[in-house]
């Protein structure tokens, strides 16, 4: 058993990949800057490149220059770079893993294996780690969602990993769970009686969850074209946001208490059928248009590869109306929306509260505006509450204005630099805390519901509705919510 107070060896498989360069290395540098890395912690890049420590250090430095968004501090870099090691290793050659063992044996650190590679490589990596006893506790393994492309493939991947690692060793990352606003949602809901007692179908009218992007497929067309927005975003992020928004009160803040409640929500999701699927699930695909005052191509023209024909059935946008069939949420519609090439980058949860049963201001207002709570996840983490307030006047006549109570994280906590989601998740993995990570049954229940939804779409196929880049998706998305008497929060 390794000493809990020792440092960590973070072994990154896929050391020169996009995830490592864009997210992991900048986050680790920030943890160094904040003095959060243990003294003896090392960062060991693994890849087939014929590199040594010096070459890898130069590669890391260039990556930080490109993705850090701030000037590298020489003293921090000196300390950070001293942690770097590189292991030239082909994961398809079992005997190559002895090279990694030689590096690992140099100290008494706890091992954290980060598989920043495609899921089809996980089996070979786990087999190699077992061959050098790097699958034994307290060793941990981090893997990125989405896992698989269906329930069947997800089970297959989880079985491969589960053959070598126990569930308490496996950390499945959904980076949205590392966002401050998502974590604060638990505190917001369960520590404030103002919302604790009103978070149900008696007081909440409907809920909207939007995750929008201005970018297109950004060179990921080989992956995205076979997956689409439902598998890439709804299964991966939106269902996690939905479960945290709607879960019942856990008995405590223990990781399994929280995840048990999320699982109950996933089990309560109402499935679609072939008769209502196209009424409640709207698919779209962007055509050419204007984003940030620049012309952009249509989805079908995204690739310059003449040998590859983009799929006209692949959705780049989806909106859906979901119901949760339990006592707390029965009858409350949840509108989910996510897409590419939309007008702005935005992730938010919008809670609309019911109006009072008796309108005493009916003489001047036939209907009252609904109170609205907006939890903004990105680009600016914030909480806004919209309430009605009397406008000051000399007369006794009531003029009501919709005013905003605004809380912005960065403005309120001026002296605290908000951490990137990956910083928090990496630090939690080092502590061995799994509450911000996804349990196996969560992943598989999400895939079960997604598979059922996709099966209905396949049984009643239709091409995605087209929408110009720079707009909020197909017209039918607005029609869907307008028919219920609501409008998208834009």
From Swiss-Prot:
User: What Enzyme Commission number does this protein have?
Assistant: 1.1.1.49
Positions that bind substrate:
175, 179, 213, 232, 340, 345
UniProt-recorded Gene Ontology molecular function terms: glucose-6-phosphate dehydrogenase activity; NADP binding
A biological process term (GO) from this entry: pentose-phosphate shunt, oxidative branch
Superkingdom as given in the UniProt entry: Bacteria
Q: Which Pfam families match?
A: G6PD_C, G6PD_N
Respond yes or no to whether keyword RNA-binding is given for this record: no
Where along this sequence does the record place binding of NADP(+)?
48, 90-91, 145
Q: What does it catalyze?
A: D-glucose 6-phosphate + NADP(+) = 6-phospho-D-glucono-1,5-lactone + NADPH + H(+)
Q: Where is the active site?
A: 237 (proton acceptor)
Assigned protein family = Belongs to the glucose-6-phosphate dehydrogenase family.
Specify the protein name. Glucose-6-phosphate 1-dehydrogenase
Species name: Buchnera aphidicola subsp. Baizongia pistaciae (strain Bp)
Its taxonomic path starts at: Bacteria, Pseudomonadati, Pseudomonadota, Gammaproteobacteria, Enterobacterales
């Amino acid at each position: 058993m390794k000493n809990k107070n020792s440092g960590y060896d973070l072994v990154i498989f896929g050391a020169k990949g996009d995830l490592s360069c864009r997210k992991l290395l900048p986050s680790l540098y920030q943890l160094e800057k904040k003095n959060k890395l243990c003294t003896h912690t090392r960062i060991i890049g693994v890849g087939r490149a014929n590199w040594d420590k010096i070459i890898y250090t130069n590669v890391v430095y260039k990556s930080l220059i490109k993705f850090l968004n701030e000037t590298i501090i020489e003293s921090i870099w000196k300390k950070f770079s001293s942690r770097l090691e590189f292991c030239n290793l082909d994961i398809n050659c079992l005997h190559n893993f002895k090279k990694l063992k030689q590096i690992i044996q140099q100290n008494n650190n706890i091992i954290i294996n980060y598989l920043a590679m495609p899921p089809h490589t996980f089996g070979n990596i786990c087999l190699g780690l077992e061959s050098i006893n790097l699958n034994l506790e307290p060793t941990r393994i981090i893997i990125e969602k989405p896992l698989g492309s269906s329930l069947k493939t997800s089970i297959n991947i989880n079985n491969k990993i589960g053959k070598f690692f126990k569930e308490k060793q496996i950390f499945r990352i959904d980076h949205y769970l590392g966002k401050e606003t998502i974590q604060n949602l638990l505190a917001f809901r369960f520590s404030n009686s103002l919302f604790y007692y009103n978070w149900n179908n008696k007081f909440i009218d409907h809920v909207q969850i939007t995750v929008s992007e201005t970018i297109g497929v950004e060179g990921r067309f080989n992956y995205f074209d076979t997956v689409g927005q439902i598998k890439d975003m709804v299964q991966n992020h939106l269902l996690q946001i939905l479960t945290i928004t709607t879960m019942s009160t856990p008995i405590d803040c223990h990781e399994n208490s929280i995840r048990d409640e999320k699982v109950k929500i996933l089990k309560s999701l109402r499935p679609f059928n072939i008769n209502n699927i196209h009424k409640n699930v709207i698919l779209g695909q962007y055509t050419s248009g204007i984003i940030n005052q620049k012309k952009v191509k249509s989805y079908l023209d995204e690739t310059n590869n003449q040998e590859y024909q983009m799929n006209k059935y692949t959705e780049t946008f989806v909106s859906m109306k979901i119901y949760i069939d339990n006592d707390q949420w029965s009858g409350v519609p949840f509108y989910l929306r996510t897409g590419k090439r939309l007008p702005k980058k935005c992730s938010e949860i919008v809670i609309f509260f019911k109006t009072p049963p008796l309108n005493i201001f009916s003489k001047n207002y036939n209907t009252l505006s609904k109170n609205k709570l907006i939890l903004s996840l990105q680009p600016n983490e914030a909480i806004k509450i919209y309430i009605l307030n009397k406008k000051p006047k000399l007369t006794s006549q009531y003029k009501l204005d919709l005013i905003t109570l605004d809380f912005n994280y960065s403005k309120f906590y001026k002296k605290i630099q908000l951490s990137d989601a990956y910083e928090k998740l990496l630090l939690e993995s080092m502590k061995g805390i799994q509450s911000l990570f996804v349990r196996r049954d969560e992943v598989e229940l999400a895939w079960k519901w997604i598979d059922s939804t996709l099966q209905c779409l396949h049984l009643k196929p239709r091409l995605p509705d087209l929408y110009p880049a720079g707009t909020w998706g197909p017209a039918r998305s607005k029609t869907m919510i307008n028919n219920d008497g609501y409008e998208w929060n834009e």
